[in-house]
């Protein structure tokens, strides 16, 4: 807010995933900064299942705790646009109304899936959402 107040000509990019992970509603956040947004990262995520080792978690050993924390931390997974928890049509609409010019599909990890397959899934979902004219 300080930068925006002192540099009104400065535009910036927003990342839908990290806005939401930071505890904010991406649609409201985008609307708040309407007019300053030029680029929106369309990044979705899903909550996976946490694997529980057979026999339970060993909280008494450092190795057991580290394994638990790794599983706990990695329960949030990046997802193809439209395959996760975020309301992508509403995010895109807010971005368009707020002056967004560029919308980038971004997925930090494909978890073994070919990145081009992930990109195709995101593309197909964007088309289904009504944004086929972007391609």
Please describe what each predicted stretch is.
Residues 1-79:
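Acidic/histidine-rich catalytic cores of soluble enzymes
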Residues 2, 76-83, 114-121:
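Alpha-helix N-cap and loop-to-helix initiation/capping positions
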Residues 7-11, 36-38, 97-102, 131, ...:
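Short, well-ordered coil/turn segments that N-cap beta-strands
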Residues 25-26, 87, 115-118:
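Residues at alpha-helix caps and immediate loop-helix transition turns in enzyme cores, especially N-
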Residues 83-96:
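A short, acidic, amphipathic alpha-helical segment used as a generic capping/interface helix at domain edges
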Residues 104-115:
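A short, acidic, flexible beta-alpha connecting loop/helix-capping segment that sits on the rim
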Residues 113-135:
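C-terminal helical cap(s) of enzyme catalytic domains, especially alpha/beta-barrels
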